[in-house]
Amino acid sequence: MANGPNYKIKPRRRREGKTNYYKRYVYVISKQIRFIVRITNKYVIVQIAKIDPKGDIMVASAHSSELTKKFEWKGDENNTPSAYLTGYLAALRAVKKGVTECVADIGLHVPSKGNKVFYAIKGAIDAGLKIPIGDISIENDRIKGEHIAKYAEKLKSENLDLYNKLFSRYLGRGLNPENLPSHFEEILNKIKSSGG
């Protein structure tokens, strides 16, 4: 807690865990367009923003709930395939508006292997944006959700009750989780044909 007269309280958004002001300062100085990825407990949110003295200007954005509403995505809205699709959708919209290059802004997310943030960035790169991310290894089978399908197959044979409990949202929407990779391809083609 506060000790002595020299103690300074950190800014509110830093205390709330929303903004890293050091990184924010670097982005403002660089004046580059940011590719912002935020992962919540339910959704993936992707925004492409320009820096402006009055406040950030959103060039394009995508929310993983759009996958369900507009493109009939039947999987979870915050898993790895939906992160990829959301990044792809946002990038298509940005490319339409003339954006060609961005800088990744992952906020307070830890840049660790297998983080969904990098799958959203990979989706944007595949859609045509140039985003420098360095040496991050991205597994292509995880993009399609093959790891989820394999786990679902294994669980279905071992424990049907747990399978029904863990994949209740998939089953409620009419998708067998074992068919997730083919469903992913179908939704990706819908996004490509719609053009964002």
UniProtKB/Swiss-Prot annotation:
UniProt KW ATP-binding keyword: no
Listed PANTHER family: LARGE RIBOSOMAL SUBUNIT PROTEIN UL18, RIBOSOMAL PROTEIN L5-RELATED
Protein name from the UniProt record: Large ribosomal subunit protein uL18
SUPFAM superfamilies tied to this protein: Translational machinery components
Free-text function comment from the UniProt entry: This is one of the proteins that bind and probably mediate the attachment of the 5S RNA into the large ribosomal subunit, where it forms part of the central protuberance.
Gene Ontology BP term (one): translation
Gene (UniProt): rpl18
Assembly mode: Part of the 50S ribosomal subunit. Contacts the 5S and 23S rRNAs.
GO cellular component: cytosolic large ribosomal subunit
Pfam families: Ribosomal_L5e
GO molecular function: 5S rRNA binding; structural constituent of ribosome
UniProt record similarity statement: Belongs to the universal ribosomal protein uL18 family.
UniProt keywords, alphabetically: Ribonucleoprotein, Ribosomal protein, RNA-binding, rRNA-binding
Organism for this UniProt entry: Saccharolobus islandicus (strain L.S.2.15 / Lassen #1) (Sulfolobus islandicus)
